[in-house]
Amino acid sequence: MRKCFFMSHNPEEKQSNLDSNHKNESSSNKRIKFKTWQFILLLLGVVIITAGITVAATIGISHKISGLTKDERQEIKKIEYAYKTLNNDYYKKQNAGKLSEAAIDGMVKELKDPYSEYMTKDETKSFNEDVSGDFVGIGAEMQKKDKQIMITSPMKDSPAEKAGIQPKDVVTKVDGKSVVGKPLDQVVKLVRGKEGTTVKLTIKRGSQEKEIKIKRGKIHVKSVEYKKKDNIGVFTINKFQDNTAGELKSAIIKAHKDGVRSIVLDLRNNPGGLLDEAVKMANIFIDKDQTVVKLEKGDDTESIKTSNDASNEAKDMKVSILVNEGSASASEVFTGAMRDHKKAKVYGSKTFGKGIVQTTREFKDGSLLKYTQMKWLTPDGHNIHGKGIQPDTKIASPQYQSISVIPTDKSYSVGDNTKYVKSIKIGLDALGYNVNNDSKQFDTQLESAIKKFQSEHELSVNGKFDKKTNEKFTQLLVEKANKEDKVLDELINKLK
């Protein structure tokens, strides 16, 4: 089985069990990304963060794979000989499957391409589940807060909701095992399981503790959220998965009935997804037989076009697209097509800039090889790879939303001079501690602000930015970002 993928996220950003062999970004380059869904683990078996973009396997240029030359056959024989030798003659017994996986993984790593990777059976399963948006679990959003695992909310009609799970329930045990102080991803692994099996959660609600048995089931995570703000329809599109276009079309019909005639398509921090859904989504606004994206490999070009007329409801609407540096791949395909066809104005900040395509080959054992195969261009032929898409009108995010993630394995104190100190200053200033953030120097003013911060949040008051202070600092910044959206507010004011 073969598919084509645009990998749709920062290739150097560590992802939890999705795209798990992407190179880990050094802590010096990480950025805190603020968007509610990025800080909540859904108990659906995986962490929802990344996706791939699938291109139909019928594209002609994806089939042109030549046979092996004589020299190439010799190289294959060498690999086969090495495999047989190590498997049969090494002084310790070897796992044949792991040897072959290591060989494939080694070939992929030699490409030095962060978008190419070899996935094991389990990694492939998780990846495919993420692309489809269907998962097996209990359907409850949860987060870690002050060492406690707290339910943010059960999803509507989910097993968790039907079992009586409520927002702010604190999970203390899973199947009788304490989860107090455990990392969130470990708790997710305990809660996940096979469809139809039961998990027992011990939850604390107020001063009472109770056990709740929940039967795991299949859950679909919606990728489109709609709200009406000042008579403007705001559609947050988290990623492009199965039926994203259908969800958006239904929401647009509802908005049209509500009298909405101006809409914002919020693609900020949308890492991408299924190309087919990006094309279908563009088709809501763009008429039949219009190019949405061009795929190129060498001298071959394939244009992917719309297949239907645009939605009548969408034709009545003024469309604005909101993007940022986290808008990648399928988000850029859609944004580029909408702008080239003059169907929307683009606001926000420059997009990620992912203009190459990956294809996949699945092995009989369920593992998968993904590698870069071609590039894509916008309908007008623009190559955005490494450049991104510049907005028509720039709306900058608050400074604290793009600070570096501060390593927790180091404590910062008076005399330190590093960009992390500047991040601390920017963050504390955003939290209301009136810190001058013009320099990277850890000065006495910052020390005083940290002491005040520590005192107000029941931390050890030492004036040092230590691990516990760092964790509380990050938690509060995330909460602040999730409560306010100055970029969207500014755009709404422009559109009124």
From Swiss-Prot:
The chain crosses the membrane at residues 39-59. Residues 1-26 are annotated as: Disordered. Keywords: Cell membrane, Hydrolase, Membrane, Protease, Serine protease, Transmembrane, Transmembrane helix. GO terms for biological process: proteolysis; signal transduction. SUPFAM superfamilies: ClpP/crotonase (SSF52096), PDZ domain-like (SSF50156), PGBD-like (SSF47090). It is a single-pass membrane protein. It is found in: Cell membrane. Residues 10-25 have a biased composition (Basic and acidic residues). Residues 124-206 form the PDZ domain. The active site is at 329 (charge relay system), 340 (charge relay system), 354 (charge relay system). CDD domains: cpPDZ_CPP-like (cd06782), Peptidase_S41_CPP (cd07560). InterPro entries: ClpP/crotonase-like_dom_sf (IPR029045), CtpA/B_N (IPR055210), PDZ (IPR001478), PDZ_sf (IPR036034), Peptidase_S41A (IPR004447), Peptidoglycan-bd-like (IPR002477), PGBD-like_sf (IPR036365), PGBDSf (IPR036366). GO terms for cellular component: outer membrane-bounded periplasmic space; plasma membrane. One of its GO terms (molecular function) is serine-type peptidase activity. PROSITE patterns: PDZ (PS50106). It comes from the Bacteria. Its main location: membrane. NCBIfam families: prc. Belongs to the peptidase S41A family. This is Probable CtpA-like serine protease.
